[in-house]
Amino acid sequence: MLLTSIAPKIISISEATWRKAAANHSQRIRHLLQPGLTPIEHDINGGKRKRRQQHHYVDDWTALDPVNPIYNFLIEYYGLKGAKGPRRLARWSPDPKLLLGDHINTDDNCKDASSVLSSSVDNGQLYKAAMKASHGLGGIVLENATLDDLGGTLHMRGAVPLPLGEEESDQLHGILYNPAVFYNRHIPLDNNNDDESNQEDRKLQLLKTIAPFQWYTSILKSTLNSDPILHCYGLHEWAMQYWPEGADPPPSAKYQSSLNLRVSRQVINDTVERKGVRCTHVDALRFFAPAAGPLNHHGASLQRMDQLRLEQKGCVHAHMDLLKIGLKLQGFIDSELMVDILEIALAARKLDVEASPYDATGYGAGVVPIETNEGRKMYRDRQVELMLRVEPVRRRLLDAYEVFMKIAFDESLLLRSDEFVGGGGGKRAAVDDDGPYVAPERLAKAEPGGLPWRKNLIEQS
């Protein structure tokens, strides 16, 4: 964890520079999503067609296809529903790492065209407006950005408008981003104006806010330090369809219901039973058929905290989940990194689908027949290739989390948070931890055919 203090500064990015970077980002996102986007005539876009007919401004983003097996995970797993989903991915924001000054790793154009402002420079009015709006914490200013840019071109989360005058106005110097401003770091934890009870309440609320970020930091660290498991062969998809004689129908039998199975039920059963399942992904277990649970070498019932020891760098679903982890930082993460993460997630999903028992060839997917020796070798080769490709992206995401938390939160809270999410000194949190705050979802369990995490909490004595 980075622990040095950050001197407040105003970083200004010229309008031409940030608009070019934002346009390039949107184009890259569109290129990646285009095969999965629905045409405007699709029923799912009915609301957008109506607004267009009423001559309201409507951008040209449409919803992802909910039956496209390569893209529908973005909807089902990560909530990128409707046209709002792709639009969310297409929004741009500057890299907070600019605020650290040294060793900037961001869009080269933004780095070269940005400048550090002080009250003595010609643009003193912009400096004063930015310092006032940021409560003296500074930030990154996108020159001449407007309110109309928010929600379309730029992220709304964390955006601070800088009015031209003393009063609030639609006329702006630009828009400022700084996670420290968004999380009220300008209010000291030892504020003398607050009584002791109010201070403790605020600390607890901040710990609740920090907990998910610290959790994902721990997951990224533990995954990077893990040994890969390269003999799982994507059998989680097969375990979802496992249906031996006398067993109840698998609850996930309707999953990917628009696709036909490319193999028989008997082949599915034989493949799952051959050597069992070696699935380390705790989120996948809940979708297993109940009969497949005992066949998992890592357990038929897992706790969320088990993710810290089980998540490993060979897991295709762990690669996909980098998108979930990155989305938590949107507004405060390098947009170039988000595109790279999306590209990785889609590549992982394609391998996931191609190795499944479904026939997805109608959507441009190939077949990795893991029910055969040749197919298992093919899967392993692809898995290793993808793992090596993901490694630097996962490291960049971990760095983005550490930079974000360094800027956004008081260091003493980060140290306290480290103690109970497994990130400090190798300590692994348990159900009976006496830490100051543990999110309820961390104290939950997953079982085949079981309830969602938040509805399956571990009973504590």
Where are these regions (language model features)?
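Basic, amphipathic alpha-helical/coil surface patches used to engage anionic, phosphate-bearing ligands
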Residues: V67, L302, L308, Q312
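Long, charge-rich alpha-helical interaction segments
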Residues: A318-G364
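Interaction/scaffold regions that mediate signaling and macromolecular assembly across diverse proteins
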Residues: N296, E311, C315-A318
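Short secondary-structure junctions and interdomain/linker hinges
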Residues: T223-L230, P294, L329-I333, A348-A355, ...
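Charged/polar, low-hydrophobicity segments characteristic of intrinsically disordered regions
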Residues: V272-L285, V353-I370
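Active-site acidic/histidine clusters and adjacent loop/turn architecture
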Residues: L2-I219, Y363-G426, D432-R454
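A contiguous catalytic/ligand-binding core that recognizes phosphate-bearing ligands
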Residues: N178-M305
